[in-house]
């Protein structure tokens, strides 16, 4: 059976798990917490690099800022969409005010901007607030 690498959303440990169409249980080998967590994780520069470099599943990153009205409007939709992708994609949020180096690295000029990373590379991006349905449809193309 083939395996996929998944970064734990709780402790950041890299786990190799059997590749399946769906999962009922999958726990981190280090912290023993669930890898099925769908709540978007908050990233700093180190955790961003770890998630993007070590995940075989797509990493969907919302670049946002606390002063951004459309970012605040989209947050519930981003969380709702994330719930559909347990171990199919990892959803994460990166505050462009506190992690400016990563935002600059990817040329973030407007927010919210959502980027999908796979195999340590950007594969697509969208800018502007999106609904949960729009996000889910967009992310599904890369699963």
What spans do the regions from the language model cover?
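Non-catalytic, surface beta->alpha helical segment in thiol-disulfide oxidoreductase systems
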Residues: 110, 115-143
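Short Cys/His-rich micro-motifs in 6-15 aa windows
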Residues: 31-40
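Typically the conserved alpha-helix immediately C-terminal to a functionally engaged Cys/Sec
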Residues: 70-86
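Short cysteine-rich clusters marking metal-coordination/redox-active sites
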Residues: 8-11, 28-31
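A short beta-strand-turn-helix
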Residues: 40-59
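Short linker/helix segments within small regulatory modules
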Residues: 17-26
């Amino acid at each position: 059976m083939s395996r996929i690498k998944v970064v734990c959303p709780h402790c950041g440990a890299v786990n190799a798990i059997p590749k399946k169409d769906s999962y009922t249980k999958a726990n981190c080998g280090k912290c023993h917490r669930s890898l099925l967590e769908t709540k978007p994780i908050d990233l700093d520069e180190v955790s961003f690099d770890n998630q993007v470099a070590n995940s075989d599943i797509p990493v969907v990153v919302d670049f946002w800022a606390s002063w951004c009205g459309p970012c605040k409007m989209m947050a519930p939709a981003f969380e709702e969409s994330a719930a559909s992708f347990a171990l199919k994609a990892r959803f994460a949020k990166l505050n462009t005010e506190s992690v400016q180096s990563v935002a600059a690295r990817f040329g973030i000029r407007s927010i919210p901007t959502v980027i999908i990373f796979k195999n340590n590379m950007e594969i697509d991006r969208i800018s502007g607030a999106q609904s949960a349905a729009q996000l889910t449809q967009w992310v599904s193309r890369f699963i």
